[in-house]
């Protein structure tokens, strides 16, 4: 359930209920790219500072340790020893951050792993399957093959990727 508690202009304060706990927005999400928060922060530390939700990265977890490994271990919550909400992204940011290691096609993105050089294909279905294996609380599909660009962006660069993302949502 998602309930807007207050609005002011375009800003919203909301309450979201998930199977792994509630989230009050706006919220700061700790980023555990590879299912761990950097800097020797323990689960107890995160609980103590009031962390409501953690964000992990679909692409990086697919590459290492592997989404099948996480699935065999019972999903991200057991793998991380974290009982609160976990959001996984689509892997789309890597289209930007690993620009030298990828090729965008209509059906998705072809990557060369930054770890071992193997070829990895990630389209909408693959992204959702990986996220299903990870068993996160909430899964994003919206950026599967969208190229993030640096400002200022030109319409000629952005339009084709926006159209591709819209087509993938159908």
Give the location of each predicted region.
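Non-catalytic, usually N-terminal nucleic-acid engagement modules in DNA/RNA processing proteins
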Residues: 1-169
